[in-house]
Amino acid sequence: MTRDVTLSLAQEFGLDAAEYQRVLDIMGRTPSFTELGIFSVMWSEHCSYKSSRHWLKQLPTKAPWVIHGPGENAGVVDIGDGLAAIFKMESHNHPSFIEPYQGAATGVGGILRDVFTMGARPVANLNALRFGSPDHPATKRIIDGVVRGIGGYGNCVGVPTVGGEVNFHPSYNGNPLVNAMTVGIAPKDRIFLSAAAGVGNPVIYVGSKTGRDGIHGATMASTEFGADSEEKRPTVQVGDPFTEKLLIEACLELMATDAIIAIQDMGAAGLTSSSVEMAGKGGVGIELDLDAVPQREEGMNAYEMMLSESQERMLMILRPDRQDVARAIFEKWELDFAVIGHLTDTGHIVVKHQGVVEADIPLDPLAEQAPLYQRPTVETPKRAPLGEVADPVGIASALLTLIGSPDIASRRWIWDQYDSTVGGQTVRRPGAADAAVVRLDGTERALALTTDCTPRYCFADPEVGGAQAVAETWRNLTAVGAHPLAITDNMNFGNPQKPEIMGQFAAAIRGMREACLTLDFPVVSGNVSLYNETEGTGILPTPAIGGLGVLDNAETATGLSLRPGLDLVLIGTGGTTLGQSLWLREIAGREDGPPPAVDLAAERRHGDLVRSLIHQGKVAACHDLSDGGLLVAIAEMAIAGHTGAVLSGEGDHVFWYGEDQARYIIATTYSAAVLDAAKAANVPASLIGRAEGTDLQVPGCTPISVATLRERHEAFLPALMAQR
């Protein structure tokens, strides 16, 4: 069923009056219903990045080890031994609020396709999740659905979920964030790209059949939520991980031949986006015959087929003489294979259905010449200095509260639902180290992987928060001994039409840029998710960062577990500020002050020292300092190693719980050598304790048993999920 095309319909589809007038000018006539649908999804924020492209161009994307940066399906970096790592992070926020299980599951499926479409076998999944307040009535249901969706899809496909992070905050009550990251490995000289070439070459559809699920999903992801959000369930796609597994194997088998000229997954905006992007990048036209599209529902019209976001589908341009080879491979894997069109020299996308031309649109205005806005920005006001904050409970009592608080408590309930070791290459499992470590099959080397962001810092000062997210990612890779190579970003923000939101976005980009430049840590891929608001209430600005590093020897990867007899050396100083700290929020009940400053030169200097010490074999365990500060980090190491510690540091609650940056705890039997190396590198360092016994002993405090800390640490999520 179609309707007459009017301004009112265009606005329903997400276009504003000026954009609709632009469509009329481009077409020289009123567009058809299908043409309007194509314009609306291609010009949505989700596909066009029309509010963010101006700012994203400021991020550094080049380095000698970067093979492909932003613009392809995923980023590609040289990791040595003739191999490339291909990785990206992407959001599935809006679908995961409406239908948590399928929203999260198809988020995993979509990011897997972005990676294997470039020729990589996926070797690891990670995620970054933000949920509402633990006491909000929807939070438990959303956590349950999201975690089951991620685990169900990843486990069935056979790709380990090796790491991630979780935050809780009331700003996510009506808008959880589900950011999924996949990493794959490919020969660096066998990377497959999406630019179509060769007028007359066939356009091939492979994978699952097309249904009505997900229609206008890209448009739904480009608007904020209201009271009718539950009615948007039909715009959430339905995933089938078993078909995805078959699709991975079939595509990789075909990629071992010389049949493929270009390949693209059908993600947001489905067949529309994949065909427009492939032809647009290649500078050719494309003609589609929708009668040939495999369909699983009867009576689908052109609009529905072009905008469906049914999962597990790919579009390819093949060499005509290799078409039979490709067909045989996909039929062997019991997947649909159909010739649905060909490339032309018109520079247009032409869509035919039942002998009727349903769409004929020039490609450039849909892609490269899509609307681009430099929206007004308002800077986030600087927070007033915090001043002195009294300690109302004491050091020991605060630790028992913090170690079990929502943002610090163990995530075991979550990661136990993920298969983190399928494939047999996982060296460091969730919770065992600051970053996941995955061995490169057939070599001694390994990848280190992590996701990081501190949204409360970003809300207080987006520029500092953006820099801190990149710096913490770099620290976590460093803490396992990896050389950090590159990042992927997932920019989760509110309504870009509000100047204060665009001000947050622009400032976060500035902070990220400075951190990436100072740390030689380029951005090679990413995703922007805007309109994360419900009934006018926006999320905390959340520029999630996914980081990738490489270790020359997987066996040298450092964990965070203490063992008896190790000295504890603090790299950096004790805490000096409580601004935006978890101590301030959980103990004092406040969320004010500026976040801790980020000294990027110190980050570089301190991290390079730590990595050097790990490579010299002088570090038995290492943990970066972040949420909760120094004492929480030591407690986490004690819990991981089932070992206590006697601490010698003299300090107040600011010293123990301040969240100053550029800091690590090193556990070592070479403390004198570590301190000498730190002095030579102009890095502050001090001996602050020794691992022994079964209690954590802080000067002036009653000892706390590690067993008690573990019990508190493990209790939060099981208790939350057991509530009725």
UniProtKB/Swiss-Prot annotation:
The organism's place on the tree of life at top rank: Bacteria
Enzyme Commission number(s) from the entry: 6.3.5.3
CDD domains, per database record: PurL_repeat1, PurL_repeat2
Gene3D superfamilies reported for this sequence: PurM-like C-terminal domain, PurM-like, N-terminal domain
Annotated keywords: ATP-binding, Cytoplasm, Ligase, Magnesium, Metal-binding, Nucleotide-binding, Purine biosynthesis
RNA-binding among keywords: no
Residue positions binding Mg(2+) 1: E90, N527
Pfam families: AIRS, AIRS_C, FGAR-AT_linker
Binding site for substrate: S91, H92, N93, H94, R113, Q237, E309, S310, Q311, S529
Enzyme class: ligase
Catalysed reaction, written as an equation: N(2)-formyl-N(1)-(5-phospho-beta-D-ribosyl)glycinamide + L-glutamine + ATP + H2O = 2-formamido-N(1)-(5-O-phospho-beta-D-ribosyl)acetamidine + L-glutamate + ADP + phosphate + H(+)
Residues where Mg(2+) 2 binds: D114, D265
Record-listed ATP binding positions: Y49, K88, D489, G526
Compartment list: Cytoplasm
Pathway participation: Purine metabolism; IMP biosynthesis via de novo pathway; 5-amino-1-(5-phospho-D-ribosyl)imidazole from N(2)-formyl-N(1)-(5-phospho-D-ribosyl)glycinamide: step 1/2
Record GO terms (molecular function): ATP binding; magnesium ion binding; phosphoribosylformylglycinamidine synthase activity
Active-site residues, as the UniProt record annotates them: H46, H92 (proton acceptor)
Annotated Gene Ontology cellular component terms: cytoplasm
GO biological process, one term: 'de novo' IMP biosynthetic process
Similarity remark: Belongs to the FGAMS family.
Function: Part of the phosphoribosylformylglycinamidine synthase complex involved in the purines biosynthetic pathway. Catalyzes the ATP-dependent conversion of formylglycinamide ribonucleotide (FGAR) and glutamine to yield formylglycinamidine ribonucleotide (FGAM) and glutamate. The FGAM synthase complex is composed of three subunits. PurQ produces an ammonia molecule by converting glutamine to glutamate. PurL transfers the ammonia molecule to FGAR to form FGAM in an ATP-dependent manner.
HAMAP family with a match to the protein in the record: PurL_2
Subunit structure and binding partners: Monomer. Part of the FGAM synthase complex composed of 1 PurL, 1 PurQ and 2 PurS subunits.
Protein name (database record): Phosphoribosylformylglycinamidine synthase subunit PurL
